[in-house]
Amino acid sequence: MADGTQYCTFWVGSLYLGTDVHRVQEVMRTLEMTPVPLAPPAVRGLINLRGQIVTAIDLRRRLGLPERPDGQEPMNVVMRTDDGAVSLLVDEIGDVIEVNEAAFEPPPDTLKGEARALIKGVYKLNGQLLLILDSVKTASTETALALIN
């Protein structure tokens, strides 16, 4: 498919989300986190990833969803950003899928606030919607601070 784009997909609550596969460094199970005092609520802590310090951003908190049920540990989608690696904490990892760019739709005008800032667009896939995250804004701790103020 010459006009397709690949996305790494994952679930956060009932939301089926994706981000550009070229930004994804790796996907991992739960890693130990160190809390960061005075950090925005979406920043769950710091992770030592083989000597590299990585900020962990909880997508449930970032998207205004309820906390994970007790005992449910998040998975890590480690992404490369211009400022270094960031881990997005998600509930479940999906697949790498390729979608036709012609099927891409911008978010509806009725989508407002933080969701509008983080969702780049939508694909309709076999009865479900794949929401594409703006990887730069989603992984930015500065955006997390601006959106809560």
Give short role names for the model-derived ranges:
Residues 1-149:
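An acidic, low-aromatic, low-complexity terminal/linker signal
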